[in-house]
Amino acid sequence: SVSRGLGDVYKRQAILRAMGRRTNQAQIRDVVSRLRKAMPDITIRTTLITGFPGETKEQHDALMQFVDEMEFERLGVFTYSPEEGTRAADMPDQIDEDVKKQWQEEIMALQQEVSYDNNQKMIGKVLQVLIEGYLYQDDVYMGRSYREAPNVDGYIFVSAEEEIVSGEMVTVRITDANEYDLIGEVVYEFTE
């Protein structure tokens, strides 16, 4: 219901205010919506903190709902950890480490589903891929497009009929996908 949804938003906004954040979920929704409308192929990446002092199960559930709704292409989730000398370290209602870890795992499990769905939508698309290496055991190259950040995102695994040199850009049609990686083949003659 709308009233329940708005209540969840307000609950989550209380945590954002406690963190000193100057944005709210409505602003984030608006910006993401405008970006996706202007650039349909955009990849939106964000990070979240869970287990901030005073965060409730209801606020965690509201965050889960937000993650599900926003369908971020890339998402990292960190658990809050107190840092000496900060206001938050001295706040009451510190969250138990086990709860923080559970909440992090719940968000990442949801994001894994979102990521899988997003990657499935990439099947059939053609991307420019920077080749970074070759996996001999699998007989495939690995690389990244503009969508994958080094050291944090998955790869695009590429089959090719001809040898490719690391550092080379190739045109790849995506043929399959899993939660975090794309699989494709070099397109030698591309016509759209």
Q: Predicted segment positions?
A:
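Single conserved hydrophobic/aromatic residue that forms the stacking wall/gate
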Residues: 1-10
